[in-house]
Amino acid sequence: MSEEQLQKPIDCADVKGEAEKISTTEGGIKAAEDKEKGVVAEASGEQAEGEVNQKKVVANPLKSEGTITIGEALEAAVLTAGNKPVEWSDAAAIQAAEVRATGRTNIMPGGVAASAQSAATLNARIGSDDTKTTLADVLTGASSKLPSDKAATRKDAEGVTGAEMRNDPHLTTYPTGVAASVAAAARINQSK
């Protein structure tokens, strides 16, 4: 392959064009079939025929029907603990949840975890609870703020709970907070 071909994105028309260039050295029939990738090609002598199967791409294959996603569990925390000011333990739990939902190891600028960290930093400097940023401020619409989402599992719940506990001065979780919501979602999903 040339350097230009390596940097050029693959187009369906190019695949058929490349299939026409296939030649056989023995003059026999060669067939290449890879239905998983959507390409079927056959060559006989100097002639080649190719077919490209168009597949529909599912927007989010990890999210299945009838299960509760991590993003939805974060939104449920708004209903149970929405008036709670965001603390470091909450920010850590939200970050762990975002990492598990998206599969990324770092947090996204402007994402749910970044907002939670900013809120926790700001809240640590403010004396009055009345003016502090709450979980409702950070987590409302969380599932739409995540670039990808997946069904909550027991491993996800354990990771989020561990993050919240490690960052709490008393090594506990808030009873109706972020970790509790993800754990409840995982229990519901496991029973299905």
UniProtKB/Swiss-Prot annotation:
* Organism superkingdom: Eukaryota
Q: Where in the cell is it found?
A: Cytoplasm; Nucleus
Biased-composition ranges, Basic and acidic residues, are 147-158
Give the matching Pfam families: SMP
Q: Which GO terms describe its cellular component?
A: cytosol; nucleus
**The motif Nuclear localization signal (NLS): which residues?**
5-9
Q: Where is this region: Disordered?
A: 146-174
The SMP domain is annotated at 68-125, 133-190
Q: Kindly list the cysteine pairs connected by disulfide bridges.
A: none
Q: What is its main location?
A: cytoplasm
Going by the UniProt record, its keywords in alphabetical order are:
Cytoplasm, Nucleus, Repeat
Assigned protein family:
Belongs to the LEA type SMP family.
Q: What is the protein's known function?
A: LEA proteins are late embryonic proteins abundant in higher plant seed embryos. The function of those proteins is not known.
* Protein name (Swiss-Prot/TrEMBL): Late embryogenesis abundant protein 47
Species whose genome carries this gene? Arabidopsis thaliana
- Taxonomic placement: Eukaryota, Viridiplantae, Streptophyta, Embryophyta, Tracheophyta
